[in-house]
Structures are given as structure tokens and as C-alpha cells.
């Protein structure tokens, strides 16, 4: 039967080998609360081992999108897993949750044990950065749906917060200040536009080093998404963070207003933080308006916190003590949506 299945495009033995290779990466993500080991039908986690009095589970799921196409082109697969974890754990973090465990779903055109191990290595790296245990997942070989070199990855994160410490944004008021945490670059959003502007229309080469970068363009674009969990949780535990936003698809314009109560808006001081060079590089090559850039990309700020004015210095000090670079990027005002002060948008 296995020979017939292999002739149909599914290599069971390669799948077994991939599982063997990923075990050591899974094991280094273990944490308090994990029950059982890799290979069960379901991942188990004992919440009673953690010191929560009224725990509320907060979950999130996401993928990496068409950033994967660049990984295929570069044949570089060891950081895409970090992106998959980051997109999920940063979302649950925005509600004040401590990520507990993570599951991944990997669909491949052909089971290549070495490539699968590289992908899962990245997932485990992301789990370590976020304090999450990788307690399960699925790797599906799907010939005919994906080409031999293609795959897709998605993840699912579950976190926990004390019921009376969940960060919902409901306590944000006019006058709250906005703290921005720097991104590592594009993160995992807007890559359909990136590929069109730089590769399809621009004809640029992923293996070439362009000014102002110090490495090939493909490596610049594949820089993994930052994971903000550990420093931000330190700030959240102070009780002085009233709202948070993960700046993902939709950029500033869609994501920052998501944390605000009705009747309030965000005024952003454009120019109050350094914008990484990948963004003006992309804007110049695509002749994109700045408003569109802020509506698609993170523009150098991957996570935003809302705090009272009197708490600003303390929260920034806490974040920077954890190695974060934090900027005062704006404030909350009456109104709807988002506006930009400082340097005008073009």
C-alpha cells in the first residue's frame, strides 16, 4: 500500500523521517504545564500548574502569507516558522495574554525531511522567544495541490490572562499617549505588493545587494517578524498599559484604531521614530503614496501601547530595560480613526 501511495505522490517514510528530525526542536520549547510528548492525537496542557486565580484563555491563529514565495525563491526556510509564531503570539499579547502553547499546520507539495526540519526549527525558535510550548501540529503532503517545492504554514496560539487583567482598551481616554516599539522590517504583511513592485515590475534580483542595504535583497525581505512577548508582558504586569495593537495587515490605519473605544481616534506624530530603509526603498521603486504605505505596512513600528501620561516614563523605562527601543509616537484624541501630525503624508 505504501508503494502505491508513494506512486500517487505521498511518501510515508519521508514523513516519518521528518517527524524524527523535528523532535529535538520541539523538546527545547517545553515549559511548565505541558503534558505528554509529541505523537499523541492531541496536545495537552495543565493550566492548574500555573499561578492564575481566574484564568481566561485567549487564542489566535494566522499564517505567513505570500512572504512564503520569497522563501521558495531563496530556498531559505529556517525563519519562516518564526514569522508563523510571531503573527499569532503578538495578537494574543495585544489582549494582555501570556502565550502558553502553539500548534502548527504545514502543508507541503513533497515531504522533504530536511526542509521540513528547517521550517520547524524556525517554529521552535519563535516558541522559545515567546515562551510558548510547541505541543502539536500537522504536516500534510498534498501532491497536486502544491508543487514539489511549495508549502504553506499556519499556526495557532493559546495564551492566558487573569480575568481582571485582560487588556481590552476600554479604559483608554482622550489624552492617553501612544508608545511604539520598533519592527525588524516588513514583518509578514504586504508581500503581494512587495513582490509586484520589486520583482514583477522592478525586475530586481533577490541575490543582489542594493543600496542602502548590507545584504542581499532577499535576505532583507525575509527578516523575521519581531516577537514582543517578553518585554511587553513586563510592562503589562505593572498594570499601567490600557491598550495594545499589533501592527499587521492594514498597517497603522487599520490596526491602531482597533484598540480604541468608540468616539476616540489616534493622532500619530509622523517623524517621531526612524523608518527602516526598506520602506523608502519600496516606496521609491513603486512610486507609492505615503498614505498607502501606512495603510499596508508597519512603517517601522510593529507594536503600540496606550498609557496614561503619568505612566509614560515608567512604562518606557520598563520596556527599554528589556532591550526594546520605545518611542512616543502619538496620542489619543476625540474623533474616529487615525490622523497624522508632524511631517505631512504625501
UniProtKB/Swiss-Prot annotation:
It catalyses: 2-formamido-N(1)-(5-O-phospho-beta-D-ribosyl)acetamidine + ATP = 5-amino-1-(5-phospho-beta-D-ribosyl)imidazole + ADP + phosphate + H(+). It is an enzyme of class 6 (ligase). PANTHER family: TRIFUNCTIONAL PURINE BIOSYNTHETIC PROTEIN ADENOSINE-3, TRIFUNCTIONAL PURINE BIOSYNTHETIC PROTEIN ADENOSINE-3-RELATED. It is found in: Cytoplasm. InterPro entries: PurM-like_C_dom, PurM-like_C_sf, PurM-like_N, PurM-like_N_sf, PurM_cligase. Signal peptide: none annotated. NCBIfam families: purM (TIGR00878). Keywords: ATP-binding, Cytoplasm, Ligase, Nucleotide-binding, Purine biosynthesis. Its main location: cytoplasm. It comes from the Bacteria. GO terms for biological process: 'de novo' IMP biosynthetic process; adenine biosynthetic process. It comes from Bacillus velezensis (strain DSM 23117 / BGSC 10A6 / LMG 26770 / FZB42). GO terms for cellular component: cytosol. Belongs to the AIR synthase family. One of its GO terms (molecular function) is ATP binding. Disulfide bonds: none annotated. Its EC number is 6.3.3.1. Pathway: Purine metabolism; IMP biosynthesis via de novo pathway; 5-amino-1-(5-phospho-D-ribosyl)imidazole from N(2)-formyl-N(1)-(5-phospho-D-ribosyl)glycinamide: step 2/2. The gene is purM. This is Phosphoribosylformylglycinamidine cyclo-ligase.
